[in-house]
């Protein structure tokens, strides 16, 4: 299994890159539009990869952001969600927006992704509602510590996640104080 590739980008399309390694081997990787926006032809880069081996193909999907990779891997495990649909979701939603949509049961967010209808949106939410979501790891450490502290005080994760992005503090203790004012 190939988990990461380092090389120089020799070809770049909106959702696909070719990386040439130091050994001279070139690999084609499908990438999200978010990842594509951060890459340039000729740039040396290391991409984390997810490899999917099918009867007719051996496909590589590349990620700069490990949370985006986790989101992709979580999605491809769901019934009726293939790699193309999962990559479309990764191209439309950040890991944080994805987590918030699942936590809040926001089917409209998923329906805004090309190729996702109401049934698929509801299925994603239903199947992932109990999963450990990405938002815990996609926020800075002090925000995650504040989230855990507020949960320990008995507040619901859904309410905390909704207000957390609006808070301005940059330390755990200040963030908890600010959150308590909003949650009370």
UniProtKB/Swiss-Prot annotation:
GO MF: ATP binding; four-way junction DNA binding; four-way junction helicase activity
Region of interest (Flexible linker), ranges: 144
Pfam families: HHH_5, RuvA_C, RuvA_N
Keywords: Cytoplasm, DNA damage, DNA recombination, DNA repair, DNA-binding
Compartment(s) of residence: Cytoplasm
InterPro entries per record: DNA_helicase_Holl-junc_RuvA_I, Hlx-hairpin-Hlx_DNA-bd_motif, NA-bd_OB-fold, RuvA, RuvA_2-like, RuvA_C, RuvA_C_sf
Annotated region described as Domain III, given as residue ranges: 144-184
Listed GO CC annotations: cytoplasm; Holliday junction helicase complex; Holliday junction resolvase complex
Subunit annotation: Homotetramer. Forms an RuvA(8)-RuvB(12)-Holliday junction (HJ) complex. HJ DNA is sandwiched between 2 RuvA tetramers; dsDNA enters through RuvA and exits via RuvB. An RuvB hexamer assembles on each DNA strand where it exits the tetramer. Each RuvB hexamer is contacted by two RuvA subunits (via domain III) on 2 adjacent RuvB subunits; this complex drives branch migration. In the full resolvosome a probable DNA-RuvA(4)-RuvB(12)-RuvC(2) complex forms which resolves the HJ.
Similarity section: Belongs to the RuvA family.
Domain notes: Has three domains with a flexible linker between the domains II and III and assumes an 'L' shape. Domain III is highly mobile and contacts RuvB.
This protein's name: Holliday junction branch migration complex subunit RuvA
Lineage: Bacteria, Pseudomonadati, Campylobacterota, Epsilonproteobacteria, Campylobacterales
